[in-house]
Structures are given as structure tokens and as C-alpha cells.
Amino acid sequence: MNIKNFIAELKRRNVIKVATAYAIAGWLIIQIATSVFPAFAFPEWTTQFVIIVIAIGLPLSLIFAWAFELTPEGIKKSKEVDITQSVTDRTGKKLNGIIISVLSIALFFVVIERIFFAKASILEDAEVTAQIETASIAVLPFVNMSGDMENEYFSDGLSEELLNGLAKLEDLQVAGRTSSFQFKGTNPDLRDVGSKLGVKHILEGSVRKSGNRIRITAQLIQADNGFHLWSETYDRELTANDIFDIQEEITRKVITELKVKLLPQENIALSEQPTEDIEAYNAFLEATQIETSRRPEDIASAIAKYKEAVRIDPTFSLAYARLAYSYVLLHDYGNASFEETKELIRENIDQALLINSNEGKAYQALSAYFTDFESDFSKSLDAAKKAVELLPNDAMAHNALTNAYFWSDQEDKRNESAKKAYQLDPLNNVIAGNYSGYLVRKEEFEAALELLDEIMERSPEYKNAFARKSAILADPPYGQIGESFKLIYQAYKLDPENRELLFTVGDRAKELDFFTLSEYMTKELERLYPENTTTLDRRFSLNLMSGEFEKAEAIALQLKENYGGERTIFYFRALNYTQGKYKEALAPIEEFEPELMQNPPVLNPSNEGWAGTTVVLFRELGRNEEADLLAEKYCEYLENKEVGEGLRLDEKFNKFSCLLVSNNTDETIELIEDLYFNENWKRRWPEGLVFNTIPTDLKKSEEFKNIVKKVYADLHAQRANVIEYLKAEGEWKEEWEVRN
């Protein structure tokens, strides 16, 4: 066969032009399918089907173009058309027009797709894209080869400090300590590690201590294929300087291999040594490993080790910072005195920052200090931002920022920060638990429960996950308070002195109108954790419910002394409202939310939660014009408030909040019934009917009284089921007998 003649014949029969036109048109159709089908929620296979059909059609169209010709009399076989009468040149011109037209449409589509579809895709997958494009690494715990288990903390601590050094680099994504240490003591598939932690590279190694010598082996591995990019063994004397030199050498080698660009200040930071004393460093490393359990006794042991570190080396700024944060943890998880703990935290933060004004962990502790002990949420946010600036890859710094945004009523930024923390340390129980809260706020309840189940399976000792799951099951859309109680009680049986479990079991009992059991759990809290704020909060609630107002007031005054007036508005509002002291109930709102008192009132995310209460109190005090104006502005604010797409419950709750202040009894009753029985909004009713500011006209209406009866009938049915469960489990106590 003569190739030139064959190609010439292909051109004459327009086979090449048909192929060109088909390829362009096929590409255009595929692009439209891949961009548009997902927007209409078409199944994945529909796009694949389109691609397969187009692929099959290509050879068929070429065969058709070769075998047939379009003539004035219609389609004929090419061999039946006299070459002198062929009109393939005219057909070719038509195909040229088709090609140009299809190319124009394709160009137009590319522009539209880049502006709209691609932009949306980029926004949706920004985190994933950033994760792929950023150099990323996980530092697995180095293996202790010394044969002495007491050296385990040293190898773990060394790994953590390598991780912390890398985490200071802005252009490097580093998996968090907790996630990386999940693989300790295993021989994991590195591809699995890379996939779970979202990293491309793994740093692993071993540590052997012998007398005053140390041998450290480190190797950098590509996660997807196990390829060793670099490996090195270091034999040195066991001194602080030598250890930090090794850490710096390993870090710089990783940076070189991953082609990470260092900022000038980052380059300087890599050479900094936190201490020159090996004994101080040993004590510090041991403390960092002890405190991770969050058990009060372990936190106390870590505090003792941090104290030892700063006693040996009074210039050890990082140890002061970690010591301060350990006191924060003891306040949260244990039974530390408020005033004493407050003083110790501030003292150690100040000392850390005096030695090193850029100690990121000190700013993390400072953020918690301002929230927990000063109620200064603006300063807390500033400190958390500084911590993230200094420690851009530290998941706990981002977690501190998440908490600070919560107290500053910046919901969107809170969500973004929670996602970032989870991206950095997805197997960290604290951070994953917070991320489940983000999923709940997005009304992705099944995903939240699935995540909590994963935490509970891998870390059954982490009781916060049980408490979070219990809360989700009790809340909409489930409303299963009884089943929620059983879940948390099972966890409580295994750890009956755990503060979180005692509180949560008492919470579920209170929501079931089961106050004898709630009282029992509160007494246990008072026995084990008398200084903890959650204990005081629970006792205040029960005192108010039982009409012991003087005792409730004493607790409110103590909390005010600890936290200041703004953070304790609720306590004094509830205390005075319950007693019919409406002027006194309004006073703290007037003091701390003055914008609600303006004419016209000004609403914002910080004060919107008090607007409905203020309307009711205005009406109780006969200030009806102010009440009507604020009610109007409040409803207008709620109507214009942005609610995330698909967040149906948020929309209903906003409507309910508006109806509650609008003197529209019929619609309010109808919506209450819908929320309780259809949306399963069943938590906090017994407490809410006492504490919440419900308009008098509504409370006095027969319709409302009937709804309350139906609510209690449902709650008491769930309570009866719980009592039966407790008796079947052999857990029942006579003092829990329900008293009407």
C-alpha cells in the first residue's frame, strides 16, 4: 500500500476532518457532562456512560466517513460514486464550518466553566488542593531500642520535638502529634499512614541510649511507594547540645529533601535550643508524654516534671509555657482551686514570655487563661491568633483559636479553624471531637456519629466522645434521651469517678425529669470535684429548680467573683426571673448588652441571644413600646440572618424565637408541637420551663398547658424505660425513687 496515496484518499473522503470534528465535539460533550451532571446530583455512572459512548462512536464515525459519501441524491457507498462526480470538497467545506463552530462553542464553554464551575470547585475543595500542593510530613514515634522501657519517654519526646520543630515552618504541613503517635508500637503500611494523615512523606527512626552515648537513626520515606529519600545514623554523646544538633540536622535535611523554603526568622528558629541541660530536657520530655492522657492524676504528675525542668534550668521558656497549660488542663479536668490555679497559670506564662517573647505555646496558654479566668474574649482571640502565627502547623494552637472564635461569636471563622485543626491532626481525640461539633452545626449528624464511633473504638478511655454522642442522640433530629442515657451510663459504669461522665449522666437524668438521680450525680461531683466549675453550675441549676434561692444566689456570686459579671449574666437573670424579680433580672443585661437598650436597638451575633429575653422582661415591667420595638427588630434580624444551605432546623428555631416575642400564641403553640414531636427537640424541657423567659400570656394559655402535659407524658415514658433498664442492670438505688 502506498502511504501517501492512502493519506490523500483519507483527506479526499474527509475522514481526517470527521475525526477532528468528532474529537472536538466529543471533548465538549464530556466537559459539559463532568461539570453539569454533579450539579444536578446525577449518579457517577452517567458521566462514565457518556464517555464510553463517545469512545465507541469514534471508530464507527471514521469507518462511516471512509465507507460512505454524502451526495445530492443522499448517502451512498463511496465505491459507488464516480470520482469525477464526487462532492467531497463541498462536504469538506461544510465540515470546516462545523469544526469552527464547535471550536467556538468549546472556547465559550471553557471560559464559562473557568469562571463559574471551576471557581465553585476550587472553593469547595480548597483544603484538599492546598493539602496536595503543600509539602507534607508525619513524624512517627521513634522506636526505643535501648531495652529499657524507662527510656520510652525519651524516644517519644525526641520524636515530638522533631515534629514541633517542623511544625513551626509555614510552608510545611505537619501531621499532629496525637495522630502520628496512633501508629506507635505497630508496623503500619506507610501508604495507609499517608492516606489517613493526609501526608506525602514519613519521618521515622530509632533511638538507642547506652551510658553517656546515644545513637539516633532517621529515615525519610515517600508514603505512596515506600521509597527511601534519605537515611542517616548519628552517634553522639548524650548531651543537650548534641541532641539539639541532631534534631536540627534532621530537620534541615528534611527541609532540603522536600524543597521547603525557609523564611529568615524560621531559619534562626531552627538553630535555637530550648535548654542546654540534659536533665532538664529529660524531665520536660517525660512531662510531655505523661499529660496526653488528660487524667487528673497524670496532669498532676506532668506538672511535677515541668517544675523539675524549670528548677534545673530557670531559662527553659518552653517548659514554663507547657507548665502553664498543664494548670489549664488541671482546672478543666480536675479539682484545682480557681484562685490558686489562675495565679499559677499567669505566673508561668509571664515567665515564659519574659525569657522568649515568641514562645507560641505560651500564647496558647494565654488564650485559655483569658477565656477561663478573665472572661476577656477579645484578648483571648488575640493570643490564639499569635499562637497560630508562631506555630502555623500546631493543631492545638488552631484548636485554641477555634475556642476563641466560639467565645467571640464568630461562627464562620470558628468552623474554618476547626477544619484546619482536624486536617492537621485527624486522630487527635480532642480535635476530632470538636470537629464532630462542626459536623453537627452543619446538620451532618450521621457523619458526626460515625466520627465519634471511630474515636470511641480506638480510644475507649476518652470519655468526652461518649458525652458528645450522648448529646447528639438526645438532640434533634433523634430526641432519644432514654437511649442517650443508656449509652452514657454504660460508660459511667466503667469509670464512675470521671467528671465528664458524672456530669453527663446527671444532665440526661435532669432532662428526663429524673431529679433524684441528677441529685445523686451532683453529690458525687461535689465529693470528687468540689472546685470544678461544672460542679458549681450543676448545683446552681438544681437549687433553682427546687426553690433554694439563697443557695443558688451564693453560687452565682461565687461564679461572678471568679469570672466577672458578663459571663454570669445567665445565672443572675435566671435567679431573679424565677423569683419574679424582673427589674433585677434585666439589670445585668442592661449593664453588659447596652446596645439592646438603645432606640432603635442594635442587634449583633454577640447580643442576639439576649434579645428575646429582654423583650419578655420589658413586657413584665410594662415597658411595652420598648418591647414591641425590640421584638420587631429581633424578628427582622432573624429573618435576614444567613442560615447555611439546607440547615432546616436553624430556620425553624429562628422562626420560633421570633414567634415567642410576637404575642402570637396559636402559631407559637403549633410550632412548639412541631419542634417537639416532629423534629424531636426534647432536651432541657424541665429546666427550661423554670429558667427560660416565657411570655406570661403564653404560659397562662390552656393550649400551652396542654402541650406541657404532652411533653411531660413523653419524657416520663422515656424515664420509665430508663428506670426499668437500671433495675435490669442491677444498678438501681432506692434513693433514686421518683418523687412526684
Where are each of the predicted segments found?
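An N-terminal, helix-rich hydrophobic module
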Residues: 1-117
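Acidic-histidine catalytic/liganding microenvironments
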Residues: 13, 169, 313, 692-695, ...
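Catalytic-center loop of serine/cysteine hydrolases
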Residues: 87-91, 95-128, 160-301, 305
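A structural "domain/chain start" motif
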Residues: 122-156
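Amphipathic alpha-helical repeat elements characteristic of tetratricopeptide repeat
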Residues: 248, 274-285, 300, 343, ...
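Short coil/linker segments at helix-helix boundaries
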Residues: 280-409, 413, 420-443, 468-475, ...
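Alpha-helical protein-protein interaction modules
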Residues: 384, 413-740
